[in-house]
């Protein structure tokens, strides 16, 4: 998807929205100079149906009821961030909350479609999330640079996840398991959670100048996520999965005629 995405849940006909900005797609949601080295502060005000939740990069400043059975959500200003990691997610999402207490206290949220509420296992997601924060704060020597951390399962998503600052979107089937899955799927979910979390420091706080260095952004997050999985969580075999999947994938890419130094 590109820009602001719209979907209807066939289970209850509820509408869900989410944004996707990377690479230069957020300009389809609002006018901007959509390049990573031009950063600004953002403050969203959103009018939405009264039964909807609205999520953005920053915490909610206020929510007030207005005529027409709607609420007006006002969010706190963001720190200076690139346009492509600004986010707007809205709909009647089911949600659960927790907090991480480390260098600072970080409110945590997990969101999914209402129809998937029974399939969500927030305990394991929160556990990996807290372990990731603890590990990265220690390794990077810096506290988490934003004010809250929400993780949202969205439908019709083209990627595994997207590292919007404070409001990470995930491919729904990667975050919410609707049936019994293998340990490999738990490994994949944890790796994705940690990959996106690593971007909060490297990619969101420290950002490449132009899109041709996006590979460095992603490579660092990929390395960091496997390191954090192996050293900071119960998933100590993370490097085995890296060698059997990522390494072979890189070898295949190197053989393509389109690959160049």
Please annotate each region the language model reported:
Residues 75, 109-261:
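Hydrophobic alpha-helical and helix-loop surface patches within well-folded domains
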Residues 1-147:
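Acidic/His-enriched low-complexity segments
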């Amino acid at each position: 998807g590109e820009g602001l995405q719209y979907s209807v849940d066939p289970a209850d006909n509820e509408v869900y929205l989410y944004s996707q900005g990377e690479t230069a797609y957020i300009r389809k949601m609002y006018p901007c100079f959509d390049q990573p080295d031009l950063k600004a502060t953002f403050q969203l005000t959103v009018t939405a149906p009264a039964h909807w939740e609205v999520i953005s990069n920053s915490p909610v400043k206020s929510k007030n009821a207005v005529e027409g059975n709607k609420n007006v959500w006002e969010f706190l200003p963001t720190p200076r961030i690139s346009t492509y990691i600004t986010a707007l997610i809205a709909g009647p999402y089911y949600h659960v909350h927790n907090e991480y207490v480390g260098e600072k206290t970080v409110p945590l949220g997990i969101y999914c479609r209402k129809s998937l509420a029974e399939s969500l296992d927030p305990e394991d997601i929160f556990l990996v999330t807290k372990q990731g924060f603890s590990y990265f704060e220690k390794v990077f020597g810096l506290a988490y640079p934003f004010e809250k951390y929400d993780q949202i399962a969205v439908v019709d998503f083209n990627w595994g996840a997207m590292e919007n600052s404070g409001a990470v979107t995930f491919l729904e089937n990667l975050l919410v398991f609707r049936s019994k899955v293998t340990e490999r799927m738990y490994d994949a979910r944890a790796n994705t959670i940690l990959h996106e979390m690593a971007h909060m420091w490297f990619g969101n706080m420290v950002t490449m100048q132009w899109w041709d260095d996006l590979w460095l952004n992603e490579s660092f997050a990929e390395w960091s996520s496997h390191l954090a999985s192996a050293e900071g969580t119960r998933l100590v075999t993370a490097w085995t999965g890296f060698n059997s999947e990522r390494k072979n994938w890189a070898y295949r890419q190197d053989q393509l005629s389109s690959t160049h130094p």
